[in-house]
Amino acid sequence: MSRPAARRAAAVRHRLGLLLAAVGSGLLLDAAFAPLSWWWAAPLGVAGLVTVLYGRRVRAGVVLGLAHGLGFFTPLLHFTAVSMGNVVGWLAVTMVESLYLAALGGAWTVAQRLVPGPGARWRGPAVRAVCFPVLWVAVEEVRSSWPWGGLPFGRLAFAMADAPVLPLASLAGSTGLGLLVALTGAVLAEGIRALRDGRRATTLVCATAACALTVSPALVGLPERAEDGTIRVAAVQGNVAGDAQDAYSRALEVTRNHVLATVELAASGSATGVDLVIWPENAADRDPRQDRVTAVLVERAAQAVGVPVLVGAIAFADRPEGMSGVTGRVRYNDMVVWTPGSGAGQVYTKHRPVAFGEFVPLRRLIRAVSGQVDRIGSDLLPGSGGHTLTVRTRDGRDVPLAVGICFEVAYDDVLRAGVRQGGEVIVVPTNNASFIGSSEAAQQLAQGRVQAVTHGRAVVQVSTVGVTAVISPRGVVTQEARPYTRAYLVADVPLRRGLSVADRLGPWPARVVLAAATVLVLAGAAPARAGAIPARAGAIPARANRPTRA
């Protein structure tokens, strides 16, 4: 083989190796999330991405970021294929989410131009280790909110439910916790590079820093003590048939399952002293406010326990006047307080419907590509009311509950709104029947555990099929029902009024990260536009740090 041919073959092998490393680091990152929940794999996965992006040009950074994203999101979001019954939606959402990491790869190659060159022995690694996490978390913030409400699944924070870093969530929420994990990964990447280059002192410093970042948050104190007494709640998991779509097509089957479980609760004696019974999202397959038979069934359950029942129901309505892009009838996802003897009362309406799961943006355009969009016959619209429901206990106290339905558990701001409006416990009704056999329910439970710490509140998660669980304000699961069974849990849940530091800060950590990321990318792009070396002494373009081979 001639020398030019050998060089070309070596270049191909090198690029293929980079792609495989990018995909592999994405797969490693996925292992940090449920069901495996190997939290320590998260910083290692981030370190792998940082390593393959070192010194690359923008185009290579985009490709490698995309490869990492595909390795990460393909297994993480497989539950969408289970829900939709086909792989088209799964592949589409995987590609969309992976494009965000492609943008991250490109943005980081631009921002690296600001990093001091080889002459700055310590400053270069330090700047890289600090700047990369800012870009990572900024991308998380964007993809968790845009477009159409975003998709927060896969945020680094949600892999930390069992990690020693979890207490940091009480100080800075998912944003700060994710920033710490990404920082740990970036520090590890610098340590690996230093080890390869024989810089033992730098390797030791990076290893020590990574350990300190991982262990020190465990020293943060987490309040758990009740501040306003307790409330005894019963979480009812009625279960559905193996084929969820078929179960909901048989009128009132799901409702009857939850009525039976509630009646069993009352007959067992476990309902003694219970203040509230919580049913899951969509537990009433017909709206009891409109359907008389359903109302009779729900009233039967409420009378059996003698306390209010929180009922999940779908309300249908005519399309609001002046609303474009929505055709025909619309839906609202409600949780209704049903009091025995007086019926429906307060209502919480879901604020964050899931794009392509509960409503279809650009329906006419997408229908031209796939008729699958019409599986969602009517769009679910967001609610505009408050984020809390108030229930009266047996001893006459009015207790406000912060509510987040299903995927809303993954949105810090939705639950924060409920807590800041006075919610003393967080209630998460969810319907996981469409995800049977997938990792979605386990991921959602991990999200609930992180949110318990973020907001300093106990979380009661109630599912049609599981996972139904009670979570302490420290993020510990204190009770859990066996999935895919008719079951109930009874727990005395602490009521808390104080606001965590994370809730006091609100959206500001995310805003600061987004602003910093914007500055980094714009500043990194400026030298390239000007065709000049950055003005700061010793700073050179990233491609000059080492020979660029991709």
Feature map (PLM): residue ranges:
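Soluble catalytic domains of enzymes that build or remodel membrane lipids, polysaccharides, and related
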Residues: 221-505, 509
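Membrane-embedded alpha-helical bundles of multi-pass enzymes
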Residues: 2-221, 437, 448-451, 463-474, ...
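Intrinsically disordered, low-complexity coil segments
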Residues: 9, 13, 112-127, 196-202, ...
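Juxtamembrane interface at the cytosolic side of transmembrane helices
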Residues: 519-550
